[in-house]
């Protein structure tokens, strides 16, 4: 009888260990905040395999995993009702999370989102061939670049969503080009793959007296517009992802007044007139 009871006790203990990852609560776990407004529950004690159990809920789906560390880092997985598989990878320093959704085979990506501690993120959606078809890059300040209809050659549509207005353009394998047109003038903001910004201006006006030209200073991120050999205004594309405009005096020799932040798309167009 004693051996029987010991056997039952051992079985119950093993079951408890196996179910440990499914029964984490505030008493036996610690909640750790993660980038992307998520959190993970980490068991206070190691399981039978000498690892810490992890549980996180993402879009109402419970993900489970284990880790050698008790700080919340590790890999968690789950399966949706449609049998697609979800994988959450938490970096060792907790500074980044990677959320991936795969097809039923567990290999073909459907979507992927990488979120950093500073709230910046990169989100990608994939087509049936496993190629990126849509992409959203969100900066720490909340402004973002949105790419849609991405083709296999890397081309597609582009949109930069700033604080209070939107710039639209195109994507190529080399760069993003965002365009604003006003009359004969076209302003192009180019963003390289590495994130470097350059701006250029083209004017099809045939009259030399009114035709606009511009020079870009990469050191100050300033586009200086000139008409009839006189500087008329500076457009500054700041690191804070804003654009300011400041006028030159009538002689075109020095700036006057203060730089004013552009808050509407029409204000950019007015600056191009």
From Swiss-Prot:
Keyword vocabulary terms for this entry = Cell outer membrane, Lipoprotein, Membrane, Palmitate, Plasmid, Signal
Q: Where is the lipid attached (S-diacylglycerol cysteine)?
A: 17
Annotated signal sequence range: 1-16
Question: Which InterPro entries does the UniProt entry name for this protein?
Answer: OM_lipoprot_Borrelia, OM_lipoprot_dom_sf
The UniProt entry's GO CC annotations, sorted and at most eight, read: cell outer membrane; cell surface
Primary subcellular site in the record, as a coarse category: membrane
Q: Which SUPFAM superfamilies match?
A: Outer surface protein
Cross-referenced Pfam families, in alphabetical order? Lipoprotein_1 (PF00820)
Q: Which domain of life is it from?
A: Bacteria
Subcellular locations according to the entry: Cell outer membrane; Cell surface
Q: Where is the lipid attached (N-palmitoyl cysteine)?
A: 17
Which membrane topology term applies here?
Lipid-anchor
The UniProt family comment states:
Belongs to the OspA lipoprotein family.
Protein's recorded name: Outer surface protein A
Q: Which gene encodes it?
A: ospA
